Curated annotation (Swiss-Prot):
One of its GO terms (cellular component) is chloroplast inner membrane. Its main location: plastid. GO terms for biological process: protein transport. The keyword Protein transport applies. Keywords: Chloroplast, Membrane, Plastid, Plastid inner membrane, Protein transport, Transmembrane, Transmembrane helix, Transport. Belongs to the TIC214 family. The lineage of its organism: Eukaryota, Viridiplantae, Streptophyta, Mesostigmatophyceae, Mesostigmatales. The keyword Protein transport applies. This is Protein TIC 214.
Amino acid sequence: MNYLISSLPFPNNFLNSSHSPFVFGLICGSLLGTSMNVGSFISLRRLIIQGIPAGVVSYLGSAISETFFLFLILFGYIGVIEKWFTLEPSLTFIITVFCADTIIGFLLDNRLKIVSLSQTTDLLKIFLCNAVIVFGNPGSTWGATSLITSIEGFQFRENSLFLFGVFLGIFVIGCGIGFLILALTNLWMIQSSKTFRSLIYRSNKIISHLALCILILSTIYYHWQVYIGLSLSTSSMPMITITKHDREPFYTDDESQMSWNRYKNKVERKNQPHPMKTLGGLPIKQFGQWFKKNVITSNPEDLDARGLPRERTKTGDYVPNYETMQAIRNKKWFSRSKNYLYIKEKIFSLLSINPMKVKFLEHSRRDMDLFYLGDKKSTRITITEMSKSDYNQMLENRKQRIQNIINRRN
């Protein structure tokens, strides 16, 4: 659909003119109405087996549901969309089970059951059934969203007219295809000697199997991570009022990708456990593994975590690398950690609460010595709170100690 809409024979200037949002919405809705998804097959089955009122109401539920999802996108209701993102994995599973149950019910019950206009309760159930299926099925909602938001040169100047055109296109074309198939089956009945029962049985079986195949394929292919085209940074306000970018398209690939990455990283940092998620209670063994991998190079300089050289051992003298010492002392080794952002935010938040208080990792030289980092009996890092002046004084004392070591070796 995306390639088809981009290859339309009329220029973008016509599509982008102030007099064409309704026409353009009608064209897009017509293309969406021809898509084959679970909702369209269920509506077609209801039209043939349960009668015209049931089929029309089912198509109406699909059209309203797809238009409502586009309404949330185009008018910037990002808060609702974020909640939909959060519920999408569970929602997809529930909708998939509901669709499978509905389709299996169609296969088991192939009798003709006409629903009349007086049966308002049954019609309402049919309407809600298709509306929920389409809204919760990524194959339907994402197909509509990716088609509309991938069009170049259209600025959605009048969203209401555009959405009305989309709704009419989806509903009219969907019903038109259903009535066309119904007319062809009627013509086939007249021309052949088959009984009406055999027609109902075969039509129900074919449509139900096709719907089940589409459901399985969409469940395998679509998942919540495919929604990378949605710009989560858009403010909750109608797009018609946004003039900062001089009516550019709804989003660009770079903008949407960056927005999604920020959202994804936020969710991952919130939900996934990290070995260095807290500054206190960090096992020495984990820190030692990280320290050996990220700080010590192929030509290791034996330093403890405070940036001081180790003492001589029986294997020989160890020459300290003072650039590495300086980097460790300035806490630059945090930048090599995969949890650098989390630790940095944690430290900044602590400083912002009380600028006169900082968190500092205090440990013994033996605990942080590389020779003992793999020892399971090593103690854990503890956190002590000190004032900012004491912390600065401690740094000055450390500089002086390093300078004294350099002077003694020289």
